Amino acid sequence: MASSSSMDIEGATQHLRDILKLDRPGNSAEASLVESQRKPSFNGELNGVLGSDLMGAAMVEPTVHNSDKLNGQDTQTICLSGDDGSICVPIRANIVEIVSSRDSSIDSKARGSNKVKIQPVAKYDWEHKYYYGNLIAVSNTYLAYAIRGANNHSMIRVLHLSSTERSLLKGFTGAVTDLAFAHLDSTLLGCVDEAGNMFIWQLTSHSSKIQDEVIVHIRRPEDTPLNSNRRLIWCPFIPEDNDESPEDACQTLALLHEDRAEVWDLDILRSNNSSWPVDATELKEGFITIRGHAARISEGALSPDGTVLATASHDGYVKFWQIYIEGQDQPRCLHEWQPHNGQPLSCLLFCDNHKKQDPDVPFWRFLITGADQNQELKMWCTVSWTCLQTIRFSPDPFNCGVLPSLKASLDLSAEFLILSDVQRKVLYVMELLQDQEKGRASFTAVSEFLLTHPVLSFGVQDVSRARLRHTEVLPPEEESESMTAEGNQGTSESRSGIQIKLYCVHTKSLQDVQIWFQPNQGDSSSLFMPQSGSQDGFSFSDPLADLNVEAMSSDKESGDSGSQNDLSKILPLPSPADFMSPAPSALPKLMTPDAFMTPSASMPASPGSSASSLTIVTAMSSSDSGARGGDDLTQSPKMSVECVNSSFANAGSPRSNSILISGLGENIQVSPPNPPLSLDLQAIDPMVVPQASPTRARSPDVISSASTAMSQDIPEIASETLQRGLSGANADSGPILHSDSMASAASILHLLSPRARSSAEHSLLPLELGAASVDGEQRLSNTPSLLETALSQENAGAAGGSCSDSSVNHAWPAAPDITRETRNSLRDNGLGDCSREEIKDRHISSPYHRRTYHLTQNDSQDASAEQSDHDDEVASLASSSGNCGPRSSHRLPVKDWKTSPRSSPKLKRKSKKDEGESSQSRQIESQMSTEVQDELLQMLRSQQREIAELRQNQLDLLQRVTSHMDAVQSSMMAHIEHAMLAQQEQEQRRMERILVEGQSRNQQLQDQLVQQLVQTLNNSLCNRLEKVLREEMKKTVPQTISKSLEPVTGQMNSTIAAKLTAVEGALKENVTKVVKSKNTTDAIGRAAAEAMQGPIQAAYKETFQSIVLPVFERGCQSMFQQINDSFKQGTNEYIQQLETHIKNRKQRDQDTRDPVIGQLQQMIDSLQSSQDQLASTVTASVSSDVQHQLHMIVGNLQDSILTQVQRIVKGEVSLAMKEQQAAVTSSIMQAMRSAAGTPVPSAHLDYQAQQASILQLLQQGQLNEAFQQALSAADLNLVLYVCETIDSQQVFGQQPCPLHQAVLLSLIQQLSTNLSTRTELKISYLEDAVMNLDHGDPVTRDHMSAVLTQVRQKLFLFLQQDAHSPMSKRARRLMMMLQGLVNH
């Protein structure tokens, strides 16, 4: 208790808060778990996999190698925390939900990740929304991003990454919806705007300036609606060694519109057009349009050869289209399916490695699809069309209303998927692992990197392996070595990591972002996770599987149940579907991309060749799969071995014993899906002969023979004529050995040949060797050599001729081909029917034998005729089936095979020596002539020479095989030792890491317990200590203080009394002196004045405001009231006096005015009478003068006036008649055309009266009546008068239009009758009148077509007569407008 009371409470409290990190969010998964168990008020957040309690988190090791845990886990939930604990979180399940961290929300104050390095490039404000296209395009040389100018016009800014030079691209309609470079090394920049206009620029740098050249510009019609969802997709660039210009390969791209997709060939466009822009409506070739989706097309992808387009739409479908740009064929839908059960799709990514393209790896093997703005991602296998993995993103519990809006992008190596959330300031990096051989791909880890702002769009420039400290980019060869070293050493000794370089568009700026982190170092167990519906016997691979030395490792160290050494006990798993084997009928029908090309005379390059091709994803129909099951599985020896080896490799456990040396493996019978076929397989070590995947291993025979059936709906690969099979009698018997030294020698010679060794890198070896049924160790030590076996069996004779026939009853064995020289020699010597039975018997005990196959009854060609060309170059040591088989003059039946005609003539003669050489010699001498004997001697000599050559070849071959086997064994032992040492070191490091992690977890647990103990003690002691201190202080402190202060108080009182007495006397004396002093008096007076000045002023002010002002205000108010009353009274009195005065004044004026008026009236009368008299006098005199002058003038001008008047009257009358005739005709036509809508007045007014009436109506605002009256008069001048009087904007600027539809139609018709005069006024009114026509009005619908057609004809005549008029442009535009309305 004493120690607790002596604690510094405030310091302990702050220390405890610092330990528990109560002032900031926790960043430890274990602390979060402990705090969530103890108190929910702590701020720690859960990181990693949910569902484990406190003790589980402390005691269970979170290793990714625990296959038992993985085997039972189908779903997984990952809660990200926003700190370094959210980097490389392992993914272990097929269905994974990733929950965003709280710190990633926009309103969070958390800082960005320290793994992210940001450098600003440009400052610009982009609108915060989800952009379906790209705002930025990145290449190794240039950077382009879309912006808006001051007048809201879209532009593209181009930056040179090395020289920081800038350029601006303009000329867009609406906003830029998508832009992209053809590839990273390309200078071709493609762009599409909201109107669908396509731009392709060629960017070059000259004298530190960026030069942009438009090489393609496709322009859409002006009435094209704007759409912000248009996309631009380039055809992927596949670099080739012989490519001189990479830009020539990138000449195909796709445009995605709302309702269609277009594929454009830039070569055809550039060859057919030399000037740009070009209207899309004028193009007839160079592109193809694809329609077929019910909703908006959101994503697309072109195959590398440009023959297949994959589209994803909001209707939920992904469709594959076969396209023919140059031909007349329409695009064909090859396959369609809904990957997300009808949800709108937003992502379509094919996992192809374009950074390091392997010609043996097929394209489009795996596919990533996304729905609902990539809230859900799925990994698909395009061979079996099965979903391999599902990833779902969900918001954190504090922001459930803000759903993720993700944009996804794969790097060129297809190893990392990068995602940005528009609604959160975060970047996700997901690691992707692919296994082409096993047909599996999955995401293995996810990393979260916090940013300062949300990313609206980004472009990945490079993903490479870099040094940890110096961020030095490793070269490709060191990168692969580093990857291997990291896989063996683990995360604790990793020296390198992944560096991602990308450019991000934020809401406030464009930034250069670099991310460095160490990838997931766990095993690849997530790649082999069981799917729903998989077989029960499926087991996960051990971590030793990656070393390829499982045959030499101990099975006792693993925790797997069951023996994995016995290959016959391994449950067979279904191999991935391929066109080499029939697929189930339930799979959708889809042709291979190779089959989409036009059939040619030769087969295209297969995936096993040097050329790259697409993954074969075609499924066969149910009828063909059943009917052709046996044929497809028994096409050729090479094909059959590939198929069975592929399925066997997928089914077998990686810990099974691998045979180190070819030819020494066990004979294992594996039943394919279609019985009764079985094969004797031998396991080949992957380190000696690399295994090929089912999709890429193709024998040359299949490639050379399958060239004619690729254009069918169900592609059928042509096979060799060789068929394989075994009879049902020996289906359950042990492996049957057919030793053939010649076949074995030829096979081994083929293995050792340079062509065979080089071709082994890309496909399975055509070598097919049997194996003896002995143990591996006995095989290595007790196997006789080839020559020893041959020599020991040489004298066996015909006694062993029935060994093979006793247990085997099948067709003639297919022997390897021999050289042309040996074949010709044997043919010339007539040994086409020689027997090989004795040679077989002579090598019956050899472990090297050739696997046998059936020749069907319909075979009529040589089994070796379809061998590839490199087989003919091998100098075989055995007879070919072409000399002894169907090419012979006869074919032996099966029952005669016991005495095989293929045996050597020399062996026949040796077998007949015992029957008596003397009788045979005598018979020969008696029956044959000397000439026949010479021929036989020559034949014997030639055969002896051949046998000697064969023996010498066998000796050479034995030496080569022995040296090769020694080298192989030494290399195998070195590999095994190295692998075992590496595995031992890895296990040791793993144990050390486990111990360190256990100690760290224990230490963390102890720290947590100490923290909680301190907190508990603090909480309990603080309350109790405070209560105790208060009670003790209340009881003891006041009493103690009073007791100690009593004597002090008495002493102080006496001392103070004495002091006060002395001070009082001195004070009185001094005060008296001071008061009597003049200075003091003055000072006091000044001080009093200064002191009293302020209070007096305030008192006066307050008194004035509170007393004087109210009294004065009341006095003024009463005074003003009295003044007002007096003024009113005086005013009334004045008014009365004024009225009386005015009345008196008026009366006096009236009295004086009457006599004056009478006098004026008299004067006016007199003046009028005098004026009348004067007027009559003047008129008479003037009229007489005027008449006299007129008579004189008329006499002189009468003739000239008559002549002029006649001419003028005649011209005016004729012109008036013509105008009247035209007006009458026009009125009649107008009355006939607009009889239904145009009223005709009963009586015509004259022109002036009509003008006055119309003007009056216009002044009154009755526009419709004014125009109707003018149009009813059938006078164009009157109509023009109305148009001139009132402006067109005053008429048509009102809404709705004051003119009726009938008046509008009549106005359009009359104004268009003559466009040669007053053209500007007429066209102006015509434009406005046409724009105000109501298409829904029945009168307009009935008469609009005829009226507008007439107007178009008048406009056409006007343009023909005066094409260069200033009004021709407006007239042409009006005619285009009328054309659209007429067609509408």
Swiss-Prot record:
Its main location: cytoplasm. One of its GO terms (cellular component) is nucleus. Keywords: Coiled coil, Cytoplasm, Nucleus, Repeat, WD repeat. It comes from the Eukaryota. Residues 834-844 have a biased composition (Basic and acidic residues). InterPro entries: EDC4-like, EDC4_C, EDC4_C_sf, EDC4_WD40, WD40/YVTN_repeat-like_dom_sf, WD40_repeat_dom_sf, WD40_rpt. WD repeats lie at residues 171-211, 227-274, 292-331, 340-390. It holds the Pfam family EDC4_C. It is found in: Cytoplasm, P-body; Nucleus. Residues 930-1012 form a coiled coil. One of its GO terms (biological process) is deadenylation-independent decapping of nuclear-transcribed mRNA. Residues 482-494, 854-866, 918-931 have a biased composition (Polar residues). The keyword Transmembrane helix does not apply. Belongs to the WD repeat EDC4 family. In the process of mRNA degradation, seems to play a role in mRNA decapping. This is Enhancer of mRNA-decapping protein 4. It comes from Danio rerio.
